[in-house]
């Protein structure tokens, strides 16, 4: 696992899914694969859960494949647990920024791990949260 002080990027589940599931949007799939290949990321237990359930449902991953993926996430990336602190901060973020319940936990997890950039396709490209976390669409023109 990477040292958290050396990792500045948090990657939301949608980008992982473009990389793992062959999509009709080849540009997004290629960009996601390149981004993942070139970086170590901060992710959360929630991201792992979302990726796994979608791979089971959409790509028919079996349990061996899911177990291998979980192990690789923990070996190759910094994984943030969902703690009471993360959940309480998520509530504050929901109130202030009007994110969904799940998105606020992602944002809170990224802030908790001191990420500078949160890559997410669906959370407002360019938005700066708490003056220190910038949301970037990995498929947008600025990516």
PLM regions: where:
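Acidic catalytic patch
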Residues: 46, 71-95
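Short, well-structured N-terminal submotif of metal-dependent ribonuclease cores
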Residues: 1-43, 58-68, 142
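Beta-rich strand-turn-strand
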Residues: 98-99
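Conserved glycosyltransferase catalytic-site signature
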Residues: 13, 103-104
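Acidic, PIN/NYN-like endoribonuclease modules and their adjacent C-terminal/linker elements
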Residues: 1-4, 108-143
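Active-site-proximal, substrate-binding regions of enzyme catalytic domains
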Residues: 50-78
């Amino acid at each position: 696992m990477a040292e958290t002080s050396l990792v500045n990027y948090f990657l939301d589940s949608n980008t992982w899914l473009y990389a793992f599931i062959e999509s009709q949007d080849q540009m997004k799939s290629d960009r996601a694969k390149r981004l993942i290949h070139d970086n170590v990321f901060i992710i959360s237990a929630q991201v792992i859960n979302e990726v796994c359930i979608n791979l089971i449902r959409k790509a028919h991953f079996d349990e061996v494949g899911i177990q291998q993926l979980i192990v690789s996430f923990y070996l190759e990336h910094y994984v943030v647990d969902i703690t009471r602190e993360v959940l309480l901060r998520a509530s504050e973020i929901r109130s202030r920024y009007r994110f969904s319940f799940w998105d606020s936990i992602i944002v809170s997890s990224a802030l908790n791990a001191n990420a500078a950039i949160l890559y997410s396709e669906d959370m407002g490209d360019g938005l700066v949260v708490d003056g220190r976390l910038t949301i970037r669409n990995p498929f947008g023109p600025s990516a």
